[in-house]
Structures are given as structure tokens and as C-alpha cells.
């Protein structure tokens, strides 16, 4: 039993409630970043500044930020990316990179882009400063993460205003979002998950199956519950948490074991008679399909799957399982027999109030293309094969 499994993250109940307007502001800000627009970010002390994502930044964006704020911008990257660039030691959080002169868009791209080699030339005078969790720089990187972009942003404080953050943002026609709302967003969105549709969908080998779709209030990606048979609410249910994998699930790609795990889990649940598979919108261990393809390209240079994520600036695994716990509760289950090899799933579910009464191993043979991937999961991520 794993009820007391540790976790480094705060429990969901430790986060103060967020109103719908704040959630909408974060959602709109992620969309603006994806379009290459600047957004205004307000920190807890009431100060404000502007940020734009590195991935979608235009050549003239740095100069526009200078004109908007009256300050020289910095490049905000994750500590993982700064470590890859040999600018800081191992750690977590966000780092601000700055120059004695104004950083250029090309320099920002070179420092944040996954194709930039760790041993490449650094601009003269480049300095790296670790930022506080509540900083504008940290919020900007978190916002880029939410937008499924590279976790890097060009950020500058506003030095040309004396009014409120809202007044400054309105004056410059920028969307305004608070740093604390960005930090808490993922927890709050989970609380708004609602079952929006359900239908009977007979599957090959599991004809008595229905699929329920859960959608958050921000209109974000839906998570699916594939319910096989008639599991009894209130009793421990045979369950599998499966993060979507376009290449493995749909295309039968051989670089991972996801397709085997998906189809194998449904077959095992059908043999058992009943259970639920949660199909979670967390492509690429939470970094999104585009970034997963970037990670594959990096792996082709000889790096493993963990190194590839870190070269991109991500953690080895960016997934959270709050949505899974919420879906299980809404389906009537607070205890599971969990089909997994991943100890982090056990820890996170327990942290979210779901009792794991048994771990059911879920192992499939290597195919010749994914041997290194499976070995890395065991040796570096602690998977139990």
C-alpha cells in the first residue's frame, strides 16, 4: 500500500482558490504567447513587466520590449537549460541570463533553442542569476510551459509607469496576468474538470466499453476515461493511467512502448472483467508533441530520453496526475489496483487522496528500437521492470 508515499509538491488543498476571471487571464495569456504577442505579468509586490516567448518571438521583439518597458530585457530559462549551457550547476527553478548590452533576438534563440550545442560559444559578458519562485521571470517560463512552447521567455520590468499594473497593461494594450495565478493554474483547472459526454464504444476484445470525456472550464484539452465492463463504485478498481502518445498509440511507433501498454492494458482489464483506463492529455511526458519530436531529434545525436528533455529545458517528466485523481473521484473510485511500472504515479495518486492498494506490473518486451529508452526508464527514472 502506498498511502504515505512522499511528494515534493504541495497538496492541492494547500493552494488558495482562484476565481474564473484569473483562470481566463492565464488561458488568454498562453494563447497570446503562442501567437508571438507580449503579455504583462504582475508580481506579488504590484510591479509589472512584459514577456514574450522565445520560440515565437519576432526579430524586432526585443526592441519592442525596450520601447514598452524602458528597460533592457533578460532571457529567462529553466535551471535545467542553464545547466546544459554550463552557466549554472544542477538544480531546479528559473535563471535570468543577461548581458551588459541589450540582448538580441538571435542571441535569445541561440541560447534557448534545443539545437544549440552545450559547448557552443557564449556571448561575452553573459551572466546567470537564479530567480525567486514568485518572480516575473519564473512566471513567464511557467506560462511558456503551459502554452506547450519551449520553456524560455524574454522578460523586462516596466520602469516607465507610476500607476497600477492594470493601468500600465491597458495603456500598452497588453493582456495582464498575475504571477501567482500562473503558478497555481494547473491545480485550479483540475478542480473544474467536468464530465461533458459519454457513449458506448465497443472495442476489439472489449465490446462492453464506454468512453467518458472530461473537460476543464478553460476549454483546454479533454481527458478520457475508457470504462470496460461495469466496475463497482466504492471498490478498488483495476486502473491504468495512460498519457497520450500520437506516435506510439496511433502510428504504432517503435521508439517507445506506449502503444503496447495502451492495447495491453485494455486487454488485461477486459480479461479481468472490468476496470478503467484514463487517457490523459499529456503527450511526451507533459511537454507536448512538438517538443517530443524535438526530443527525438536530440536523441538521434546520441542522448537518452532524460537528457533530451533537459537539453530542451524541461524536467525529465513534466506530468502531473491531479486530473487522473479528479476523474477517478468523479467516477466513484477512491482506491485502485494500479497497472504501472512508474513509482511517480504511485506517489502522486497517494498525494492526491487516491489509495493504491496494489501495484500491477505492466511490462512488454523491447522491439529493437526502444531498448535504450526502456533501459533509461529503469536506470534513471526508477521504473520497476
Swiss-Prot record:
One of its GO terms (biological process) is riboflavin biosynthetic process. Pathway: Cofactor biosynthesis; riboflavin biosynthesis; 5-amino-6-(D-ribitylamino)uracil from GTP: step 1/4. The keyword Nucleus does not apply. GO terms for molecular function: 3,4-dihydroxy-2-butanone-4-phosphate synthase activity; GTP binding; GTP cyclohydrolase II activity; zinc ion binding. The keyword Ligase does not apply. HAMAP family: RibA. Catalyzes the conversion of GTP to 2,5-diamino-6-ribosylamino-4(3H)-pyrimidinone 5'-phosphate (DARP), formate and pyrophosphate. This is GTP cyclohydrolase-2.
